């Protein structure tokens, strides 16, 4: 069997769990080439404006993004994309993808999530191909990053909860990586922030598992404004 014929995970319980873990760690690793390192989700402007100046401020900002902003929204869209794909409900998947794209608050954030979603799909198609991927993608005008992860995870038989927790961990880790370069923070402080956000990630995952599409919404005006103002920031390292 070649790499491109990887297909769904084997049915044997132990082998399936290990295969799911292997794929999950690969897809959500910083080494998976979707360009996450080049985006800050508006953090660069928040640092420039003085909203984030140390580890405590970064922790508070990210906790709010998780509970009341894009973290929760993206997690909930991943959940709905995974479930729709599992049920082979293409109409529902298309609706989820359309709504997820519409929720993005700024042009640069749209670029960020659409580009990462597109890259995720392309790499999955090339290295981890499976039946149904092309058909599912064809039904969606835009596949943003969380929808892409939910879709591919379901098609490969990766269970929803570990996929969701892995996604949120990867999301937070990327934010912290950006913050550590911008504030800047040392490696130990960065890990302290990641450790402090563990219960917030768990709570966000649990909430998103039970959220309907009507429950999805954000209340992070300052973070959304940062992503808008970053578009005209004079000196910057990141694309968002």
Curated annotation (Swiss-Prot):
Domain of life, source organism: Bacteria
Gene3D superfamilies to which the protein is assigned, alphabetical: Urease accessory protein UreF (1.10.4190.10)
Gene (name only): ureF
Record text on subunit structure and interactions: UreD, UreF and UreG form a complex that acts as a GTP-hydrolysis-dependent molecular chaperone, activating the urease apoprotein by helping to assemble the nickel containing metallocenter of UreC. The UreE protein probably delivers the nickel.
Source organism: Bradyrhizobium sp. (strain ORS 278)
Keyword annotations from UniProtKB, A to Z: Chaperone, Cytoplasm, Nickel insertion
Major location (coarse): cytoplasm
Similarity comment: family membership: Belongs to the UreF family.
Record function comment: Required for maturation of urease via the functional incorporation of the urease nickel metallocenter.
Name by which UniProt lists this protein: Urease accessory protein UreF
